[in-house]
UniProtKB/Swiss-Prot annotation:
Required for normal meiotic chromosome synapsis. May be involved in the formation of meiotic double-strand breaks (DSBs) in spermatocytes. SUPFAM superfamilies: ARM repeat. Keywords: Meiosis. Disruption phenotype: Mice are infertile due to meiotic arrest caused by defects in chromosome synapsis. They lack zygotene Rad51 foci, and are likely to be deficient in meiotic double-strand break (DSB) formation. In addition, mutant spermatocytes exhibit meiotic arrest at entry into pachynema, whereas oocytes progress to an abnormal metaphase I. MEI1-deficient oocytes are capable of fertilization. The zygotes are capable of initiating embryonic development but mostly arrest at the 2-4 cell stage. Among all the zygotes, approximately 5% are androgenetic and do not contain maternal chromosomes. The lineage of its organism: Eukaryota, Metazoa, Chordata, Craniata, Vertebrata. The keyword Kinase does not apply. This is Meiosis inhibitor protein 1. Signal peptide: none annotated. The keyword DNA-binding does not apply. One of its GO terms (biological process) is meiotic spindle organization. Strongly expressed in testis, weakly in brain, and not detected in spleen, liver, kidney, small intestine or colon. It comes from the Eukaryota. It comes from Mus musculus (Mouse).
Amino acid sequence: MTAADHPAFGRDEEAALLLERTHHRHDPRWLLPVSPHVCMACALELLPEPGVSLVRKKHVVFCFQDALVRHTSLVAQLVAQDQRVCIHFVRVLFGLLNSVEDGSMADLCIEVLVQLTTQPNMEQTIRCLMNECHRELCNLRSMGGSLATTTLLGKLVDTIPGLADELVMEHGNLMEHLLRGLVYPNEGVQASICYLYGKLYSSPTAAEMLSGHFREKLCALFLSTLDSAQTKDLQINCLGLLRQLLKYDLFVSLIMNKSVPVEGAESVERPSRETSLPLVLKKFLLSRDEILQVASSHCITAVLVHSPAKHAVAFIHADIPEFLFEHLSSSSEILVWSSYNCLILLAEEPLFFSKCHTVYGIEAVVRSLQGSQQMTNTELHTQGLLLFKEILTRQPEEIRLFTSSALCRDASRALQEAVSSPVLAVAAEALRAISAFLRKDHQSSLPVQYRALRALLEAMLSRCMEFSQTPLNRRSLGHACSRNSEKATLRKGSFLLSTLEGFRNACRLAVEFQGEPSAQENPFTAPSAEKEDTLEAFSEYLLSACDSQCIPMVMRYSEEATHPKLMEVFLSILHSLFVIIPHMKVKFSRKLADSSFIRLTLELKARFCSGQSHSSLNQVCSSFLYYMCLNLLSAPEKTEPLSQEELSAVSEFLQHGLPHISSRTPESLAFLSDRQYVEAATRQRQYCILLLFYLAHIHDDRFVPEAELFVAVQSFLLSLQDQGECPPPVVCKASMYLLAVCGDKDSALAEAVISAIRKFLEGIPDLRGVYTHHPLLLRFFLAYPGLMSRFGHRVLELWFSWEESGYENLDDDSSPGRTVFPANLAALFRVLQSTPSILLILLDLVYSSPVDTARKVLIVLRVFLWENEDVKVGGLIRGHFLLILQRLLVEYGASTSGGNLPLLLNLLSLVQMRNESEQELDSMAMKLLHQVSMLCGKCSPAHVDILQPSFNFLYWSLHQTTPSSQKRAAAVLLSSTALLELLEKMLALTWTETGSSPRTPLLSSAWLLTASFSAQQHNGNLQVHRTLSVELNQVLKALSFPKKMSALLSAAILRFLRTALQQSFSSALVVLVPSGDQPLSTPEDAVLAPLGKSQVLALLIGLQNLLVQKDPLLSQACIGCLEALLDYLHARSPDIALHVASQPWNRFLLFTLLDAGENSFLRPEILRLMTLFVQYRSSCVLSREEVGLILQGAALVDLSALSNDTLQALHGFLLQVQSMGLLNDQHMTQTLQSSLEGLCSRTFPAQPLFQDMLCLGGVSVSQAHIRG
């Protein structure tokens, strides 16, 4: 094959590469078949020829190198054909390398040799080349010509694996020549030798073999070379060798302990100095070359990695930290990174802080953190935060790090931005830095930046909330999904733990500042400004943040996993919050208890703290429970707070017992139930368990099975009794409560347990100390006769003292059975229904309790009696009433200002009202009547609170009994001249009262009582011991011209006047006197005396006006009075009666009353009014035709839908129409007859007593009495 066979092989290339005169003799196999068509045989002949120009040789070598790069495998096959040819070619190139002075030619030869020897199966060639290099160095008289050889060796060792070891083992004496090169005054040679040394020491095996060489010969020489290096190549290669040396502890120790003298170059007179590695590296740090600065930083880091404790001091004494801090302001990320690494390791040495390097450098660190936030290199940001954290953590407390509040604020802002980073690693490192930052000595620069600290915590918690709510990717299946989920949970737990540690340190900071008056608030805040930058505001924020963020995050995480360390930090936060805001500790403790934190803490102790494991968690749990229990007991919601002495006792057994409680609930119950002999320490643990269960139940955390707890508490109490022990009151309280709330209807206590309870309670001076306000506890004490007889009175008193005063709002006028009562009241009612005898205890409470408690008892009794119509209580408690009333009267004597007396009288009147049928008044009732009348006689009209219920009772007593008893009762009351005198005063007060006043209901009762007394005296011809004087003109004036008088008072006066009219003003009891001497003006006045005709007409107009008001009760009273008036007039002058009944205004009145719609005439008062008009033949008021229309309407009405009052009034109207013969029409007569027959076939039973008697505005009223 010739060059012509290759079209791409040009003539010029052939002339350059081939020896034409000899190439034809060469075997074609030495010719590369692709471009460039190098003939190796030609190259071997051309390169050694001295007559060939260097340019041509260089071109040949370049083409061979190009072919080696482009067609590596082909060239490898080419040279591998004959090993001898290959070795010869290597020797030719090596000879050319050492013979030429052209640096580029030398570099080209080195590159070809290196590339060629890296081909497969070149071991013999490599060995040959090593021998050539060894021979060359040994034969050199001066190391000045060793540059090419040493450079080649360095490249070969770097490229060929294992060559360094082989070179050291087989050519060890080369090291002596290399030492000669280091002292040769040529930095190029020195640089190549350092490069070679660096590659040799990069091999651990070679480094071990060369350790003695370094220790004895190279160390000092190298350090001197490093110090004196001027060219960048030598500096970089020296630093490269240093990096390799610093990988090994031995060389680090040797070089760090070595110092070498260096002569001054500036002046002959200048004495020589000694240098060391820290000083040399400091010089590189001071250079303006970034590469050297970075390399120097790397070397410092490499030294410190081995042992900061051994070597950091030397660097600190060399002031290295100062310059590292300066480099933090560099724009080079790699330089800042390197400086961070050095400073992190230097921070492990206390001298780093005692020489105040951190004080001078902290500002640079903060600025660097602020600058790194603008970079995209998150690892750099993380490393800076790590350095900041190390400084903050290790800084001695006595050396203040932040010398101004402004710098502290800048640091806080930098951390705030860092923790808000979306990169998890940055945020996590920022959390650790924040924990270290929140230290008292770091925040003591006044004024304390509470606002900045709050912003920092807000950012920290917000970032944690955001991360904790990140959903897990569950799309993958199987074990991979499980592993990913576990890793994600661990990451969340670690992040949350760091957050909680930071928050805990903030809480600790707040506690420590409480004792610092100067740290309470910012003195530079304007007085009118809002006090946000204060310790108090910061402390309140901590509590709020824990409540709204920390607790929810921990609870959510605990659903996935439970980390002991995390829970330890969390509980320590809760514990510290009790101290931070003392005035909120009780409220906070209640909220924690309501959120099941007692259960949570006990479960943690049971799970992790059994035996001696997690002792720190056990301590934190015990301390948290201790303070929470004391807080709950010191200001409980439903029971009396403990005395200081009791708190001390509780504190003692909690302190001793809580650390030893680490059992699960079943084990705790079994421990509590142990009936064997119990030692003092064990008993304290039982007290602790019982108290924890009690507080948990109080706050509705019922994690203990109630049936099992019920049995365990009984066993516990019997154990105490067996050993003759008397438990502390708080233990009794807990036991009673748990027995009450855990027992059901079917689980009754054994008599032995009841006996033990009674014995324990009798040893307690006041049940207030063991009472817990709960309906089940009330039922517990009242369900067992042995407890009720001894403690029922006091328990009920405590019950009402704890009840809220909201019973006054209960509507006792509502229909029974329809009112929805509060839970506690409903529970009490159930107890009263099951045991009515408890009502006697309640009556005693009315007498013996404070006014507020007695009022609650009264309301409860009133509502209970109103709601429970089937409970017969009159006979049960009437005797009790008499005894209590007598005791009150004896106690207060002539005074009527007893606070409970009105309440008792109210209840007495209510019980009287609850009588459903007429009953004979027995001796007990008569005595009560006598006592009440005596009491009224001692009162003045101002005693409204006593007189009103008393008058109600007297009124009901007269109207709720049989006629014979009414006569006896009236005789008793009429014998009380003091009562009659009081009534006279009350009646006279009517004319002085203006409008509606608080005394108006009492005046109404007085008029009704007077009317009743007058009727009973007149009907029974009873003896009168004192008369009542009433001004008739005032009565008529009040009714004729009513001015803002209440409807009830008007009805009462009407009833009085009606009684007087019915008696024709001849009552022996009531004397109606005129206002003054008024001569009779006409004969009619004489006939009507003591009334005058004008008064009659004025009274008629007044009655009409009152009827128009359409008040049902007032209307009935008006009609009754009108009936009595017309009867009175008819008896004296029928013409005047007819004239009064036929007044035109009566027709207008009638039609005014009938405008209420269809069948509006079917109202009792209207029917009675029409009956009067028919009776007195007032055709001008009600014509025959209109009567017929009324009859037609009545015939069509469903009688079953009408009330008894209406039916009776309708029956009276029809009878009156029939008797007057007003109907001439046969059809109408039949209609009338049919209606009468329909009514006669029906019976008109008397209205039930409890429906007849009303309580209107506090006034007892009998509808039958008003209606007449």
